[in-house]
Curated annotation (Swiss-Prot):
<feature type="region of interest" description="Disordered">
    <location>
        <begin position="28"/>
        <end position="54"/>
    </location>
</feature>
<dbReference type="GO" id="GO:0003677">
    <property type="term" value="F:DNA binding"/>
</dbReference>
<keyword id="KW-1078">G1/S host cell cycle checkpoint dysregulation by virus</keyword>
<comment type="similarity">
    <text>Belongs to the papillomaviridae E7 protein family.</text>
</comment>
<feature type="region of interest" description="E7 terminal domain">
    <location>
        <begin position="1"/>
        <end position="44"/>
    </location>
</feature>
<feature type="short sequence motif" description="Nuclear export signal">
    <location>
        <begin position="89"/>
        <end position="97"/>
    </location>
</feature>
<comment type="subunit">
    <text>Homodimer. Homooligomer. Interacts with host RB1; this interaction induces dissociation of RB1-E2F1 complex thereby disrupting RB1 activity. Interacts with host EP300; this interaction represses EP300 transcriptional activity. Interacts with protein E2; this interaction inhibits E7 oncogenic activity. Interacts with host TMEM173/STING; this interaction impairs the ability of TMEM173/STING to sense cytosolic DNA and promote the production of type I interferon (IFN-alpha and IFN-beta).</text>
</comment>
<keyword id="KW-0804">Transcription</keyword>
<dbReference type="GO" id="GO:0003700">
    <property type="term" value="F:DNA-binding transcription factor activity"/>
</dbReference>
<feature type="compositionally biased region" description="Acidic residues">
    <location>
        <begin position="29"/>
        <end position="38"/>
    </location>
</feature>
<keyword id="KW-0945">Host-virus interaction</keyword>
<dbReference type="GO" id="GO:0019904">
    <property type="term" value="F:protein domain specific binding"/>
</dbReference>
<feature type="compositionally biased region" description="Basic and acidic residues">
    <location>
        <begin position="39"/>
        <end position="52"/>
    </location>
</feature>
<keyword id="KW-0238">DNA-binding</keyword>
<keyword id="KW-1114">Inhibition of host interferon signaling pathway by virus</keyword>
<keyword id="KW-1048">Host nucleus</keyword>
<keyword id="KW-0862">Zinc</keyword>
Length: 111
């Protein structure tokens, strides 16, 4: 730079594109034992997911929920209080969105 302030002419860029090799020369040693080990880990994970929780696990994860829905016949509001796990309340929600309908006490007495 010559002078007090740089000018565009003072800045000289010598940039040229350089080819870069993007190939990876790394080789992975894939053996059957590693594949079997990974499969065993996946199987173990899936089997743990399928295991039923113990009674103590169920008691720890229980929560109270308020459910408000409408009677299938008269459309009046029906309020329920349930005590269950988050998994169970999610399943209950799916049932209510499907073919399971709640009936109010008045309609239940007349049906």
């Amino acid at each position: 730079m010559h002078g007090e302030r740089p000018t565009l002419g003072d800045i000289v860029l010598n940039l040229h594109p350089e080819p870069v090799c993007l190939n990876c020369n790394e080789q992975l040693d894939s053996s059957d034992s590693e594949d079997d080990h990974e499969q065993d880990q996946l199987d173990s994970l899936h089997s743990r997911e399928r295991e039923q929780p113990t009674q103590q696990d169920l008691q720890v994860n229980l929560q109270s929920f308020k459910v408000v829905t409408r009677c299938v016949f008269c459309q009046c509001l029906v309020r329920l209080a349930v005590h269950c796990s988050i998994t169970d309340i999610t399943q209950f929600q799916q049932l209510l969105m499907g073919t399971l309908h709640i009936v109010c006490p008045n309609c239940a007495a007349t049906e």
